[in-house]
Amino acid sequence: MSMTKTETVHSSAEALRYPWEQHPGEDQVVEVATGVLWLRLKLPFRLNHVNIYLLADGDNWVAVDSGFGNEESIAAWTRLLDGPLKHVKISRLIVTHSHPDHVGLAGWIVERFACPLVMSQVEYLQSVYHQNRGTEERRNAQRLFFRRHGMDETLTDKLLGRGQEYLQRVSVLPASYRRISHGDEIQIGSRRFKVITGGGHALDQVMLYCAADKLFLSADQVLSKISPSVSVWAVEPELARRISGVAGEPHHHPAL
């Protein structure tokens, strides 16, 4: 297990640059700026990883996102906390949005470190909604939605059969949280971050921007080599009409 330190690269070029040729390996942590650690956890999908950031906060650290809620991610966190992060104490967990690869281990981390969960209200309540949506009434509404959009019975049944996967990918959420909202400012160590929220990929996704250091944690709102997924769900079917014709530090792919 090792911690790799690299120098921050600044450039006036307009094109995106990727100063770190290698992403953190398994059980490794990379310091991408003073007091900013980057670690990467595996995902069981085609998009096979999620980036987690730790921000220095005095003698403690603030974690930004938690990873996928499965045994493999717990094992990876445990190895890191026994290795390069063995002296790390997480004082706050900021979760950017309600998708399982970001909120999945929130309950586990909050319990382990007795730290508060920090989210936007919409994203916290969206997580609660997903954990309680497996009722027959909701399944029937989803079935009707899928059929209206041309899916046959076989594919509809297959998709509905995945309905409980959210529960399998997310540890039990803490019963309370600390709310942050667009425009808030939060102090983390010597840095002051402005909270920016955005819709599209998620309803009210949290991003953090430190103007003094030109440091931006973009979550999944801005990705480096792919476009964020913007989906239309049964709970808000008219969204497809509203977005029709619109052109259109990331938490997937290399750090910018």
Predicted regions and their residues:
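Residues that act as N-cap/strand-start positions at coil-to-secondary-structure junctions
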Residues: 23-24, 47-49, 172-174, 180, ...
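Active-site HxH/HxHxD metal-binding segment of metal-dependent hydrolases
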Residues: 72, 78, 82-186, 214, ...
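Conserved beta-strand hairpin/beta-sheet module of binuclear metal-dependent hydrolase folds
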Residues: 28-88, 208-221
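Accessory terminal helices/loops
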Residues: 1-28, 132-160, 165-166, 184, ...
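Short beta->alpha connector loops
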Residues: 44-46, 98-100, 199-201
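Short Pro/Gly-enriched beta-strand edge/turn motifs at strand-loop
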Residues: 10, 32-39, 163-169, 189-191
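Short aromatic-enriched loop/helix-cap "lid" or pocket-rim segments at secondary-structure transitions
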Residues: 50-51, 129-133, 229-230
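Metallo-beta-lactamase
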Residues: 61-71, 169-177, 185-187, 192-256
